[in-house]
UniProtKB/Swiss-Prot annotation:
Residues 74-89 have a biased composition (Gly residues). This is Squamosa promoter-binding-like protein 7. The gene is SPL7. A motif (Bipartite nuclear localization signal) lies at residues 165-181. The keyword rRNA-binding does not apply. It comes from the Eukaryota. The SBP-type zinc finger is required for the binding to DNA. Its main location: nucleus. GO terms for molecular function: DNA binding; zinc ion binding. Residues 74-98, 172-196, 261-306, 320-360 are annotated as: Disordered. Trans-acting factor that binds specifically to the consensus nucleotide sequence 5'-TNCGTACAA-3'. May be involved in panicle development. Expressed in young panicles. One of its GO terms (cellular component) is nucleus. Zn(2+) 1 binds at residues 108, 113, 130, 133.
Amino acid sequence: MEGNGCGGSGATPRGVVGMHWAPVVTSPPSPQPPFLPPAPCRPDVQMQQQGGLTCLKLGKRPCFWGGDGAGQVAQGSGGGGGGGGGGSADQGKRKEKAATAVPVVPRCQVEGCDITLQGVKEYHRRHKVCEVHAKAPRVVVHGTEQRFCQQCSRFHVLAEFDDAKKSCRRRLAGHNERRRRSNASEAMARGSAHPHGMPVLGHGFPPYGLPTSSAGALSLLSSARATGPWLMPTPDISARSSAALDELIAENRAALLSWQFFSDRQPPPAGRPTGRSPGSETAGGWHAHLQARPPPPGAGGQHEHQSGHVTLDLMQATTAAGGSGAPFRPVPARPAKEGGDAGCTSDAWTPSPMEGARVV
């Protein structure tokens, strides 16, 4: 046991390795400074340091704090001030240029026209065309013959105009379309505002079949319900109707007299009864007397027997009829006979023996 121990003075037995522990040589430790407690700092300096760490420099005024950052911030602010000074210098140069710039005087854009548009109307000055060339049928602008359009207020080529029109074809078509729409709307408005609900057709003209003049009030078939704006006023209807009635009676009498005049010239066949009253024979003799009278001088062939034309003085017939006071007397129509004209009423109206008309 003693030989196996680490200590002992005996020899090391065979087969056993001996281990010797040698001491490690190390450098002596360096002297460390003595630990000093931190110096007490003032609260204002500490707040400035914290503010410098959290400042994002987003405002116009830079953040100032103590230490090394203060110099950097001061340098940065100085550089910014230099930039601001450069901007103000540029603005000053711009103002000087604007003050020294010469105002451009507008001129007519037609080639060969150097008229300044300084004392003309604002319209010509704005569109850069003088008054003479604005109305000219053709001018040369940019090497092409053009014309100034009064509605577009600019130049067009001559192919866009119709004949000597001052406005282009496209603008004229739009203008005409707007006029047609306005006229149609006005006509519809007038028709809806009519007291009898009767629309006005054809751009203000009366409907087809009605007279277009004031003589429409003379119609005997017109009534107060059918009166429109184209007819006569109400106070004159009675007087006009009376005049129209007299005129119609005169025309009827003239037609009957002319028919009797030609029937007397061609006597009926032998054996055919005339069926006329004695008064009609008197009228026939009166017509024969008129035929025997020579035509007035200067009458020409119009009043000859060969011409077959008769001119009646309707006013004379109307006056004579009104003065005699003997109206026409209706006579029953003749019955239809074999070989004769069915429904022929030659004696439907027989004039009075005392009534007459002047045949010229």
